[in-house]
């Protein structure tokens, strides 16, 4: 049999009280039972024996009062009680700043107590849950407030508690995260309580009972009983007893404090269906609240964090993991790196790796080349055959390089002359300097064919020149000393210039014999 608080509609109460588990146990009220031919009621995929429609709020059974989920996570009872008191004080203070009715603040505190009898303070932040409870209570009591206002009020209370200068809350990523946490906590409260979140308060019951006792005109008695009832919201009496019993206990305590006599033959509370033992237990629980010290928020937060870390360590230890998430070595069957017969750290000095030998030989060759480059003969030793070959190769390269570089200043000089003469002289000088270029066959025909052959010779010489540049190996280019090459280039520049002048004079004389009339003008222009 499931029971729940006062529903908004009959259909909602039927579905809520039957489909979702309630935090309470047995309750009295109007009960309607519907039985099918199979002996139960099928709602969804679950079979229920009966559906109870009641206006009474749920009461937590005695077996769930101790141990609580927080105590099972390692939190002691005094710390849990202080956290409950502190959370209810936050809800009460925030409700005053939000200008909520007292009924809404009372509903939020009752929801706070109910939730933490199902969940642990170690796993859930009591401040976030307090925000969610007061936000949910404002909706239940038809006085809704925005989540932004709730967060701002709790931020202000936190600053006052820390004795800091009040400052507005910055709307940054932390605010967005807090807002999302409050929304998720509100859903969690609804789910955990089975959406049975309506609370029957004893506020109106107190006024009604005092009218029966003809004490409603005593405003001091009414206000004192009302105050005791509001203070008892910080305790767990609202989840343990019926609202009628709580109203009788508040009137009993106020009349004793003000020394106002009430009927005793028979006792007045027997008229309302309560017992003296329950009234005395509620009074003791309420008066104990005034003897407790004010809870320290910082110490409670540290205690909760400590228990949270211990719980996390216990979970990781049960899974065989370290604190950083890595697997523990003790769970790997006694594995130890030192237990191996031969460790890779132990390397014999006599043994040499073939890789290291190859590296040494590779490193030795550039050292020999560097030592050879420091010699006055361009790094060539006379007593080896390899050094002779490298010297001859370096000389031929230096000559070829100097010749190719010597064309650079002449190129600007030849631009002043005719284009055909420049191309022909340049192609012939380059073809003579490169031994790899093929021998030219002069065609003594028309000047157009000569120009065509001249362009072909220029292309072939350029192509062979590129091939020669690409064929040079990297090792030969490293052996050439830059300073010696520049000195040779300066020394031999005049010599090669003379050779080019002689070659051009020879060409002019050779052409003059065969083409005296056609090329004579160009020859005079060169001179």
Curated annotation (Swiss-Prot):
It is found in: Nucleus speckle; Nucleus, Nucleoplasm. The modification Phosphoserine is found at residues 336, 339, 353, 356, 375, 446. The keyword Phosphoprotein applies. Residues 391-433 are annotated as: RS. CDD domains: CYCLIN_CCNL1_rpt2. Residues 343-353, 362-371, 500-509 have a biased composition (Basic and acidic residues). One of its GO terms (cellular component) is nucleus. Keywords: Cyclin, Isopeptide bond, Nucleus, Phosphoprotein, Repeat, Transcription, Transcription regulation, Ubl conjugation. Ubiquitous with higher level in liver; expressed in striatal neurons. Contains a RS region (arginine-serine dipeptide repeat) within the C-terminal domain which is the hallmark of the SR family of splicing factors. This region probably plays a role in protein-protein interactions. PANTHER family: CYCLIN. Involved in pre-mRNA splicing. Functions in association with cyclin-dependent kinases (CDKs). May play a role in the regulation of RNA polymerase II (pol II). Inhibited by the CDK-specific inhibitor CDKN1A/p21. This is Cyclin-L1. It comes from Rattus norvegicus (Rat).
């Amino acid at each position: 049999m499931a029971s729940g608080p006062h529903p908004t509609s009959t259909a909602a109460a039927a579905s809520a009280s039957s489909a979702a588990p309630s935090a309470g146990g047995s309750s009295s009220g109007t009960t309607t039972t519907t039985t099918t031919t199979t002996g139960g009621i099928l709602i969804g995929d679950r079979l229920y024996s009966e559906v109870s429609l009641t206006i009474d709020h749920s009461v937590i059974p005695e077996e769930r009062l101790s141990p609580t989920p927080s105590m099972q996570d390692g939190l002691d009872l005094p710390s849990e009680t202080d956290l409950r008191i502190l959370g209810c004080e936050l809800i009460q203070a925030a409700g005053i700043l939000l200008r909520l009715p007292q009924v809404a603040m009372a509903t939020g505190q009752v929801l706070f107590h109910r939730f933490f009898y199902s969940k642990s303070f170690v796993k859930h932040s009591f401040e976030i849950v307090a925000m969610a409870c007061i936000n949910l209570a404002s909706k239940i009591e038809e006085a809704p407030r925005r989540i932004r206002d709730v967060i701002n009020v709790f931020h202000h209370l936190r600053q006052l508690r820390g004795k800091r200068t009040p400052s507005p809350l910055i709307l940054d990523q932390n605010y967005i995260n807090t807002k999302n946490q409050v929304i998720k906590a509100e859903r969690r409260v609804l789910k955990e309580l089975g959406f049975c979140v309506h609370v029957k308060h004893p506020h109106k019951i107190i006024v009604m009972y005092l009218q029966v006792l003809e004490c409603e005109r005593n405003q001091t008695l009414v206000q004192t009983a009302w105050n005791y009832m509001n203070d008892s919201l910080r305790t767990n009496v609202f989840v343990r007893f019926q609202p009628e019993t709580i109203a009788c206990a508040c009137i009993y305590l106020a009349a004793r404090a003000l020394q106002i006599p009430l009927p005793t033959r028979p006792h007045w509370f027997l008229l309302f269906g309560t017992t003296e033992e329950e009234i005395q237990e509620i009074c003791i629980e309420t008066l104990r609240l005034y003897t407790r010290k004010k809870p320290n928020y910082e110490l409670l937060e540290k205690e909760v964090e400590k228990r949270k870390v211990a719980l996390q360590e216990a979970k990781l230890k049960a899974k065989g993991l370290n604190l950083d998430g890595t697997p523990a070595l003790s769970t790997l069957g006694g594995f130890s790196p030192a237990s191996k017969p031969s460790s890779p750290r132990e390397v014999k000095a006599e043994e040499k790796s073939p890789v290291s030998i190859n590296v040494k030989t590779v490193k030795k060759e550039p050292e020999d080349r560097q030592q050879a480059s420091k010699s006055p003969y361009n790094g060539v030793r006379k007593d080896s055959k390899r050094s002779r070959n490298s010297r001859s190769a370096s000389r031929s390269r230096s000559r070829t390089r100097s010749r190719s570089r010597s064309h650079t200043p002449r190129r600007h000089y030849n631009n002043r002359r005719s284009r055909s003469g420049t191309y022909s002289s340049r192609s012939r000088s380059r073809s003579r300097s490169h031994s790899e270029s093929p021998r030219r066959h002069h065609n003594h025909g028309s000047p157009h064919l000569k120009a065509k052959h001249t362009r072909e010779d220029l292309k072939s010489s350029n192509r062979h020149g590129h091939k020669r540049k690409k064929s040079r190996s990297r090792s030969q280019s490293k052996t050439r000393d830059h300073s010696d090459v520049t000195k040779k280039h300066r020394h031999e520049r005049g010599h090669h210039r003379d050779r080019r002048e002689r070659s051009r004079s020879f060409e002019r004389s050779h052409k003059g014999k065969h083409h005296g009339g056609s090329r004579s003008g160009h020859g005079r222009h060169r001179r």
